């Protein structure tokens, strides 16, 4: 079996994807697999045809990789692949759609308001609507970006127009959420129809917020296992993570990010990553390690889950 690790790509998360792809490629080589690394570009269909792979290990993040696009191409070409399918991928990458599903399923998520624009937006009108709907502080997000790209924290009325403008440079949609102060926790989920939640991780950023720099610079964030929260809150997060994974129809592996409000004794789902980072500073491999699963074994497990029910 020839495996192609598809990485790089055309999104703003290209650099992270190359690092993820490289780590996966080396792990599969160590395990003795016949493996090639494929840097995705506009000619990906021709490359896949030329390489004639039997299985694709998707290591792409963001646009065209995590949104159902590459999954659709692989389905057409009859190449089985790792992770979630077209629908789950396209739903999970869209934070607004994810929140609608979470609300419908009764899974706690921060209150929000969403906007969509085709023409010049009226920043004052948007600011006014946000202030009528939510209390400050708020978090403004580009709904289809990952790696904490396109996120602005707003603490005063005066900051709103500038923050809105900044996020709209990235996306034509806006997701505005209430800011929940608490403990940031992530749940790594592994499996298909019977998913398992690996040990929860508390994220402590050395910068003010867990942003792109804190996420990918060694030493700028700390991963604490188990999180320093009450056991019943950990249990809630595990239950909501599994429920979220199933509600979106995820497969293989995914990471569900939470904000834990200790005062309200609640775990709020923020978002779902259907292709979590697999770099040296990544959360998913850390959770697996805490469960006694080596990086190489984790990569092989994800590969096996991708093959389950998908062999040619």
UniProtKB/Swiss-Prot annotation:
Q: What is its EC number?
A: 6.3.2.4
The listed locations are:
Cytoplasm
EC top class, as a word: ligase
Question: Per its UniProt record, what InterPro entries does this chain match?
Answer: ATP-grasp, ATP_grasp_subdomain_1, D-Ala_lig_Van_CS, D_ala_D_ala, Dala_Dala_lig_C, Dala_Dala_lig_N, PreATP-grasp_dom_sf
Return the Pfam families for the record.
Dala_Dala_lig_C, Dala_Dala_lig_N
Q: Where on the tree of life does the source sit, at the highest rank?
A: Bacteria
Does Cell wall biogenesis/degradation count among this protein's keywords?
yes
In its UniProt record, a GO molecular function of this protein is:
ATP binding
Cofactor binding remark: Binds 2 magnesium or manganese ions per subunit.
Q: Which UniProt keywords apply?
A: ATP-binding, Cell shape, Cell wall biogenesis/degradation, Cytoplasm, Ligase, Magnesium, Manganese, Metal-binding, Nucleotide-binding, Peptidoglycan synthesis
Please tell me where ATP binds in this chain: 131-186
Q: Respond yes or no to whether keyword rRNA processing is given for this record.
A: no
Q: Which cofactor does it need?
A: Mg(2+); Mn(2+)
Per the record, its GO cellular-component terms are:
cytoplasm
Signal peptide, first to last residue: none
Question: Residues in domain ATP-grasp?
Answer: 99-304
Q: According to its UniProt record, in which pathway does this protein act?
A: Cell wall biogenesis; peptidoglycan biosynthesis
Recorded hits in HAMAP family, A to Z, give:
Dala_Dala_lig (MF_00047)
Which PANTHER family does UniProt cross-reference here?
A: D-ALANINE--D-ALANINE LIGASE, D-ALANINE--D-ALANINE LIGASE B
Q: What is this protein called?
A: D-alanine--D-alanine ligase
Give the species this sequence originates from. Answer: Carboxydothermus hydrogenoformans (strain ATCC BAA-161 / DSM 6008 / Z-2901)
Gene designation per UniProt: ddl
């Amino acid at each position: 079996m020839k495996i192609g690790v598809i990485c790089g790509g055309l999104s703003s998360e290209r650099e992270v994807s190359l690092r993820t792809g490289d780590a996966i490629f080396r792990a599969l080589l160590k395990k003795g697999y016949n493996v090639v690394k494929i840097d995705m570009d506009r000619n990906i269909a021709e490359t896949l045809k030329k390489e004639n792979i039997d299985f694709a290990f998707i290591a792409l993040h963001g646009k065209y990789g995590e949104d159902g696009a590459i999954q659709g191409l692989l389905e057409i070409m009859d190449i089985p692949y790792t992770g979630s399918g077209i629908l789950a991928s396209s739903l999970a990458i869209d934070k607004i759609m994810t929140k609608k599903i979470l609300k419908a399923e009764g899974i706690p998520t921060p209150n929000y308001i969403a906007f969509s624009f085709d023409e010049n937006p009226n920043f004052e009108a948007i600011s006014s609507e946000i202030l009528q709907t939510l209390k400050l502080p708020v978090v403004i997000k580009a709904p289809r970006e990952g790696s904490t790209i396109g996120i602005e924290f707003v603490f005063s009325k005066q900051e709103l127009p500038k923050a809105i403008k900044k996020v709209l440079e990235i996306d034509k949609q806006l997701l505005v959420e209430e800011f929940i102060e608490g403990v940031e926790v992530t749940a790594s989920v592994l499996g298909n129809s019977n998913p398992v939640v690996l040990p929860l991780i508390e994220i402590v950023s050395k910068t003010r917020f867990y942003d792109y720099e804190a996420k990918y610079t060694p030493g700028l964030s700390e991963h604490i296992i188990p999180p320093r929260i009450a056991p019943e809150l950990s249990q809630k997060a595990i239950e909501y993570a599994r429920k979220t994974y199933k509600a979106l129809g995820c497969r293989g592996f995914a990471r569900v990010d939470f904000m834990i409000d200790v005062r309200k004794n609640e775990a709020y789902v923020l978002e779902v990553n259907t292709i979590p980072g697999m770099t040296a500073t990544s959360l998913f491999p850390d959770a697996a390690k805490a469960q006694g699963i080596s990086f190489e074994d984790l990569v092989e497990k994800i590969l096996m889950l991708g093959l389950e029910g998908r062999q040619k």
